[in-house]
Amino acid sequence: ESSERVLLTSTDGKTVRVHDIASVQGEYDLSDGYIESNGKRCVILSLEMLKGNNIVMFGEDVDEILDQFRQDCLPEDVQMRRITDQPEVVGTSVSDFLRDLLISMVIIVVVMIVLFPIRSAMVAALTIPLSTFVSTGIMYAMGIELNIITLACLIVVLGMIVDNSIVVIDGYLEYLAGGMSRMEAAIKSVQQYFWPMLLATVCICAIFFPILLTLKGEAADAIRIFPPTITINLMVSLVVAAVIIPLLNVAIIRKVKEKVPGKRDITDWVQDWYDRTLAWNFRHPWLTIAGSIVLVVATGVLFPLLKMRQFPYADRNQFAVEIYLPEGSGLEETKKITYELTGILEKEEKVTGVTSFIGCSSPRFHMSYAPVIAGKNFAQLIVNTESIEASLELLDKLAPVYSNHWPGAYVRWKQMDYLPVPTYEYRFYGNNIDSIQKAADMLMQEMRTIPELEWVHTDYDRPSPLVEVSLDPVASSQLGISRTSAELQLMLQTGKMQIGSIWEAGSVDGKSRTYEVPLVLKDRATEQMTFSDVDDTYLSTATGASVPLRQVAGVAPRWGHTKIVHRNGERCISVTAEGKRGTFALDIQNRIIDYIGQMPLPRGVRAEVGGETEENNDITPDVMAGLGMAVVLIFFFLLFNFRKFSIAIICIVAISLGMPGAIVGLLIANKILGLTSLFGFITLMGMIMRNEILIFEHANEKMAAGMSAKEAAFDAGKRRMVPIFLTTATTAVGVVPMIIAGSSFWMPVGITIFAGGVGMLLLVTTVLPVVYWKLYEKGPSPNPPYREGGVTTDNVGPSAVHHTPLHRGRGLGVGLFFFC
């Protein structure tokens, strides 16, 4: 009311009040855009958690405040509903992972009960909760938060934490069967296997860290806590195996269970099958080695068939829909299409809610889905559904039908994604807009012939109709109309302008508050203005008189770009496209890149590939550098332990034996090979290294005891097969719940470990003994027996294995020094 009584002075000196010449009313400005939820106008409240807080607790606090607000403050005619809830998404994910973790524990215990004698299974099973709970406590003390990354690490490492315990239990049973007392067998089993276990565990832990040094940006943030979590769990499991398990062995396993004549268990069947297979391999050594090489090469040929994507799609029970109309379209046109599409969505039974942003865009509600710079020709819908599966089903059903349903408009159906860039993006740089536009048009024409692509467009949009006003310098100066005053007057008469603010009183939580309300000046006559009316617009002169615009300026229509994009200071036009659902970028990208390389670009124009290809090109060297550093690190560990270049190189090359199973598994499951799958492969590398060390250490010790290379290799295979089978089985079944859960983020990791582990088990145990035999067939023993006073010191025990303390201490010490 006070604004209506403000006094104004006219050019002739008369005084009037605002309400004499204008109407003043309070209203929401809906001329540029507004929001609706389930067909009703609404306002949006968006909350974002401060860094360093617990998002689940944050969500609980918000729920408490909202419930209190509903009871005490919410008017009866106002409804409040939630569109997105990140705390709920995170809380559900954490709960699911905790469930999968417990299921994995149960599965591993059941597998051990099936494969082990009951007392041995009891001892090994105690390792799982003991190591997990101690590791979780250490993680808490170190400030490592519990989230889906750390929980996924716990599931991945769950089967591996029993590996060392299985090795110690197996050694204990062997020595116990050889006639030792329980205490002697417990001590001897730790002495025998501690250094190989320590070396293998340190190797596995170490290979995860180099990639942290090479990766950067969002990729590094996503995996930052993976290596320390793995390391803590494995090192704790090593301590448990070396300190706790021997005591449990003495207390629980009092004697070796005698075999019942005629009764055979699973490990007996596995051992018999393996003995026959290994004997055949030793009869055909070169065929075995050649066959393994052919198998690895063949799976390498299959590698390009994998679906590759840096980050997978998000598992969300919602999706977004974006509506694009030609530049210059009015809000009413956008509203009409939005209402029609909203009606279509609301008829779907699996849709639980639709929120429409007409002329505007939503706040950020997903980490990699940035708000769109909106206009009157844009609308966005957030569609909530019953489940993740319902979202995918609706996208598959509606996207092909309604993407181009409305003439002149494109409807983009957006599945939530972790990839922050367009899949297909190609840029042209140059100083001349017409030249870069010509290059972009050539590429778009080619891309529109590719059936897998849709919505091929540029970020310059389409040329829009403009009204160009050219001020006559002579006539305007005679009347005292400057360029600035003409611009201001035209802006006031053709649009609106904020000329100030007023403050209104209100209350929050029972306390008085004031809040700012913008004061906007606009001419209602301009709402229906046409092009012919622009000439008749009046401008005030320096003398106070008003003249029509046509008297001091020329008015002409023309087409022009509403925006000119610059990138790194250069004019740039980007051609982007969407891939149809179910398509992947690699083959299409290569075709487009080849076409760009053959394009006759205008003078002064250069091309650049962006989008997913650019992201992959940025991250791939970092990933390869990290893996390379890990391999070098492993090589030096092995070199200092075995003191032979040949055996260290064989171990590095043998890492490839895990690839056939992993690649075939991903192909059969039809899953994406992405950044998270990398940790599945690194885990597989660690499993292979552990088994290599156990096999080659045993073979070295047998040769040191006087066996030939062939006898030592054959005995190493036979003796280490069952422990390797048991450790691989527990690791593989540990990730089964992760596979069954079907998460797009973690299922490929589980498949890589499961399928790769099975393939690795078959190849490592059948090929490496043969390779070892051929490597040392004509050469000297890799570790000559240690002699005291010229007499060979024989080891006491069933395996007749001798340890060289000096060799053990020096090799490991130098290895640890290099690692530090």
Question: Predicted segments — roles?
Answer:
Residues E1, E333-L419, V474-G495, K511:
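Solvent-exposed, membrane-proximal periplasmic/extracellular interface segments of envelope transport
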Residues E1-I103, I169, M444-A630, I634, ...:
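Extracytoplasmic/periplasmic membrane-proximal domains and adjacent transmembrane bundles
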Residues I83, V90, V94, I169, ...:
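Helix-loop junctions and hydrophobic alpha-helical segments within the transmembrane domains
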Residues L158-Y172, Y193-T214, D221-P261, L381, ...:
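Transmembrane alpha-helices and their membrane-interface boundaries in multi-pass membrane transporters
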Residues Y193, L247, G262-F311, K718:
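Signature of alpha-helical transmembrane segments and their immediate interfacial
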